[in-house]
């Protein structure tokens, strides 16, 4: 199971460099990332495989992980409508998507309110 980590750094130059350098030096592959800023803060979601190791490395780099959750990581076709079809199946089954972003290799990362039910649908 892949983990999505969330940290909320100050909005300043070098935060993502520090993240990438710390992960790289520790041999951690960042498989996906979503980052945005507002009101002086950033919100960064990072997709990793080795959750425990990544948590230790991010903490040592001064990146305070605020949340971690299991996420679905789906290989999807790189074509129009592929994401919509998956999201429609979940919606029709009343599974709420709470977070979504694309990761490397046309993979869709979804955090949902019922991960077990979602697994059976996708």
Placement of each model-derived feature along the sequence:
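A conserved regulatory-domain signal marking ACT and ACT-like small-molecule sensing domains
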Residues: 1-122
């Amino acid at each position: 199971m892949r983990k999505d980590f969330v940290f909320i750094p100050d909005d300043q130059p070098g935060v993502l460099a520090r993240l990438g350098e710390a992960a790289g030096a520790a041999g951690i592959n960042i498989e996906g990332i979503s980052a945005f800023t507002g009101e002086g803060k950033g919100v960064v979601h990072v997709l990793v495989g080795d959750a425990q190791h990544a948590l230790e490395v991010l903490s040592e780099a001064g990146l305070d992980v605020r949340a971690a959750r299991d996420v679905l990581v789906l290989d999807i076709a790189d074509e129009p409508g592929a994401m919509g079809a998956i999201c429609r199946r979940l919606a029709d089954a009343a599974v709420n998507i709470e977070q979504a972003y694309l990761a490397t290799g046309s993979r869709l990362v979804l955090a949902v309110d019922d991960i077990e039910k979602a697994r059976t649908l996708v």
